[in-house]
Amino acid sequence: MLIILGLILMIVVVLVGGDRGAMSLIALAGNILCLSLAIWLYAVGAPVFLVTAGAGILISCITLFYQNGTNIKTWSAFLAVAITMCVLFAFIYLVVWKSGAGGLNEIQAAGEDVFYYNMNLDISMPKVATAVIVLSTLGAVIDMALTVTTSVYEVKCHKPDIKMNKLVQSGMKIGKDEIGRAHV
């Protein structure tokens, strides 16, 4: 039944979205493959942060450049995503490390199921928790970066003689409006 629903979804996406819908499905498949590869690399003992950085870059490239083409807007969005994710990576790692997140919570650790778990893993659960949080935020960051860079690009096209500080203020206002709209 799930396969049938998935096929119906794909058909509807292609019928409604046309070429863009097909490109979105291909990008989704590429992102799923990238995440699957990252999980496999985590499992075989590859460095979690390097795999996370590589997966983040690859997912960003697939989402931005494959779906939207290579132009000044997508390169600006990619740079914004890279900078934002580096800052978020450090902040998320600090919060996860200080809070002791990762692994089993108190309820799971007290349950009987824990007796059947293999506790001899060579994987740092706080690092995996950081990787999961970072990769989970990536889609929202990409969406916001592309929205703001496209809007600022349009402002610059319609007002070519706008001063840089006004353009930055415009971008900040657009970003605030977009965050407010997205979280209401």
Label every PLM stretch briefly.
Residues 1-34:
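Membrane-anchoring/interfacial helices and their immediately flanking loops
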Residues 23-106:
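Transmembrane alpha-helical segments that form the functional core of multipass membrane systems
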Residues 71, 155-165:
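Juxtamembrane helix-boundary/capping and inter-helix hinge elements in multi-pass membrane proteins
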Residues 121-140:
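Hydrophobic alpha-helical transmembrane segments
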Residues 139-155:
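Short helical (or helix-break) motifs at transmembrane helix termini and adjacent helical loops
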Residues 164-176:
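Helix-loop junctions and hydrophobic alpha-helical segments within the transmembrane domains
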Residues 182-184:
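Conserved small/polar residues in nucleotide/adenosyl-binding loops
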